[in-house]
Amino acid sequence: MMPFFPHRVLKRKMTALVSPHQDGQIIAHLLKWFHITPINGSSNENPRQSALELMRALIHGYDLCISPDGPRGPRMRMKKSPIYFASKTGKPIVCACYSSKPCKIASTSWDRTLIPLPFAKGVFALSNPIYVPEGLDDDGVETYRQKLERIANLQAQECDALAGNPVIEPADVYDFKKKEG
């Protein structure tokens, strides 16, 4: 449902970073169905090249779809990369989320992904554009990261409540780091 939204409703050109591996290529194929241009890349393998490709897309008028908690979590904890992209390009960040019912919540995955079931009804939410100043120091980046994380998580809670789903809470950062280490 979410991939359908930008092209059909907002009439925007969209791109998203997808893994060059087999699972990512399945996602890339699906994104093309929704008129979202996939960029093959990884935040692990050659992240600088991936960042350059994403910057080029932004400069050429594409909006960038980023999962703000990254490919490995922790769940619902914003990474810094959206803030860096916005700061470098002057493009705003718009937090977008959805919830639907009926759905399946992937309870065994770290991110508790919500998967809409056929004929589900959905709720979408978009924040107002959030502009990030150029040249932020580390404290400024962290301030914006926390602000965006709060906005995105409140939106997700509102969408879940409107759809009649249980609220999925952000992961405890301390517990997540303990499991990784």
At which residue positions do the language-model features occur?
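Non-catalytic C-terminal accessory region of glycerolipid acyltransferases
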Residues: 10-11, 33, 52, 56-181
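Short, well-ordered alpha-helical scaffold segments within catalytic/effector domains
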Residues: 24, 48-55
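A conditional alpha-helix N-cap/helix-loop micro-motif detector
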Residues: 44-48, 75
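Catalytic core of membrane glycerolipid acyltransferases/transacylases, capturing the structured
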Residues: 1-45, 89, 104-106
